[in-house]
Regions:
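Conserved active-site carboxylates
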Residues: 178
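Structural motif
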Residues: 81-82, 106-108, 133, 172, ...
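N-terminal lobe of the biotin/lipoate ligase/transferase fold
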Residues: 2-164
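Short loop/edge segments at beta-strand edges and connector loops
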Residues: 86, 173-175
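Long, positively charged amphipathic alpha-helical accessory segments at protein N-termini or as interdomain linkers
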Residues: 1-28, 42-43, 147, 153-171, ...
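Short, basic and Ser/Thr-rich N-terminal targeting/leader segments
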Residues: 78, 103-105, 175, 184, ...
């Protein structure tokens, strides 16, 4: 009902709509219409009202509501089922539950705020209300489980290409899937697979993008290591950023389903800020220092250490050393 009231106001943008007309069209009382108007105002919609003239929509908040996204999203699959919440503990937890209940491929779970967002290596992810894109995507690919880890590289490629379209051409990928701008982290990606040794049941891809956060709003421990689109002087509505990202993710994913991961891995190499750099890798049980030379066909990082041997890194935390 609230969406219907909002749509009435949108259709008459710049003009007034009477409460009586809306109540008759929606088959509810004028008091009910007023309550919906009040609720919309509380969500940030600027609606003015005058006796005998009705209501007029002046400005909409930058919310990721289903109605806002439905108007602009041009994907075929991603986001066709769109689960939206004001707040949740974690979109990955919500998406995992939906996937276990049989939610279709392309289901998007998005929230305005996460209470317990998670990144790689079980780290927390700062997810304040209305400041970023905090969402998870359900995938049901038909490739073998051994290929699943490369989905995280695929996502990093898609998001980086989307940022370039927004004008943020300095965005690049630190292995495996952190997206950095001048050394500061813009995006976190967490991919979780469920299935057997032979078959993938589903993949839940959790993504956090800092969009509107300002430097002074960051927690003290993030001030020197995090960034946002706003901090990089990219002025974009969250809905538009989300549209570009979902469309790029869908395009990249179906390219992989059609043709495999080879081209995506080549694109990853081109967008990497890791390859060719001196790095330190903290891998399970070992720490290595050397030069990142390439990724292999499985997306693992190849590092040439001081004695000339090549170490293959399957999992670990990479730090890029400043150039001398």
């Amino acid at each position: 009902m609230r969406d219907e009231v909002l749509e009435f106001l949108r259709q008459n943008q710049g003009g007034f709509v009477s409460g009586q007309d809306m109540s008759e069209a929606c088959h509810v009382s004028r008091t009910a219409i007023w309550k919906h108007i009040k609720a919309l105002r509380q969500k940030g919609y600027k609606i003015e009202s005058y006796t005998k003239r009705g209501y007029r929509l002046l400005e909409e908040p930058d919310l990721l509501s289903p109605l806002a996204m439905k108007q602009i999203l041009k994907t075929d699959v991603f986001g066709k089922r769109y689960v939206y919440m004001d707040t949740t503990e974690s979109t990955n937890l919500e998406a995992r539950y939906l996937a276990q209940q049989g939610a279709e491929e392309g289901t998007v779970v998005v929230t305005e705020e996460q209470a317990a967002g998670r990144g790689r290596l079980s780290r927390g992810w700062y997810s304040p209300f209305g400041k970023g894109l905090w969402f998870s995507l359900i995938l049901r690919p038909d490739f073998p489980p051994v290929e699943a880890p490369k989905c995280t590289l695929m996502a990093a490629v898609a998001l980086t290409k989307a940022f370039h379209k927004m004008g943020l051409t300095d965005a690049g990928i630190k292995w495996p899937n952190d997206i950095l701008v001048n050394g500061r982290k813009l995006v976190g990606i967490l991919t979780e697979m469920s299935g057997s040794m032979e078959e993938i049941s589903h993949i839940v891809m959790g993504i956090g993008v800092n969009v509107k956060t300002k430097q002074e709003e960051l927690p003290e421990e993030l001030k020197l290591i995090a960034t946002s689109l706003a901090m990089e002087d990219i002025d974009i509505e969250r809905t538009e950023a989300f549209r570009l990202i979902l469309e790029e993710l869908e395009h990249q994913y179906y390219e992989v389903l059609d043709s495999g991961f080879d081209e995506t891995l080549n694109e990853w190499r081109q967008l990497s800020v890791t390859l060719g750099e001196e790095i330190e890798v903290r891998a399970p049980g070992n720490t290595y220092e050397g030069v990142a030379t390439d990724i292999d066909e499985d997306g693992n990082l190849l590092v040439r250490i001081s004695d000339g041997t090549i170490k293959r890194i399957v999992a670990g935390d990479v730090s890029i050393r400043p150039r001398k």
